[in-house]
Amino acid sequence: DRCLSRGLGDVYKRQFNEVCKKGPVADEPVMGMMVRLVDAKLHEDAIHRGPAQTIPAVRNGIKGAMMRAKTVLLEPMQKAFVSVPNDWLGQVTREVTNRRGIIEDMPSEGDVTTVVGVLPIAETFGFSNDIRAASQGRAVWNTENLGFEMLPPQLFDKVVGEIRTRKGLKPEPNPESYYAC
């Protein structure tokens, strides 16, 4: 309360919002996070508790806490509907499952089956050409966005490294200790 009553509450809120725009893991927006300020020591002399001192301390404290927490990445997902003659059903289901897809349903009408699967959007690049090749051009497909799901933990380090490299950052994020004051 003492920190907030000295006008620093706005500094904390602003830094929280800034960190949430570009998190320390992948330099991507952060959501679903709460920070609770438990304690803060301020220098007695007002000249030593200005923005130049408090902003980096608050920002680094939030980033350090994030690195200590069990951070997850969310990836966009989509549902694919692929209608294909039964002769090419195996090839189409293989294309879906090879892209971390999960087949939810396969209703049939005559000699055409519709494969209904959920796939990460990141795995769908080239999907159109591969489905066309797998079905000799006989498949018809479309997709709908499903929102976001948690990236499987075993892919976390690989995907974070790819994102960071694409952004010109070193592949591994700074550890919690980097942000210690």
Give the ranges of each region predicted by the language model.
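Single conserved hydrophobic/aromatic residue that forms the stacking wall/gate
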Residues: D1-Y12
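Short, contiguous acidic/charged loop-to-helix segments that flank catalytic cores in large enzymes
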Residues: R6, D45-R49, V116-V118
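A broad, structural surface signal
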Residues: D10-N17, R59-K63, G90, R94, ...
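Conserved helix-loop functional segments at active or binding sites
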Residues: R14-V25, D39, N60-V72, N98, ...
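Flexible, glycine/charged-enriched surface loops at secondary-structure junctions
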Residues: K22-G32, R68-Q78, M106, W141-N142
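Beta-strand-rich non-transmembrane domains
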Residues: V30, M34-K41
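Glycine- and Gly-Pro-enriched alpha-helical subdomains that act as flexible
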Residues: D39-M77, F81, N86, G90
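Charged, surface-exposed alpha-helical interface/stalk elements
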Residues: E75-C181
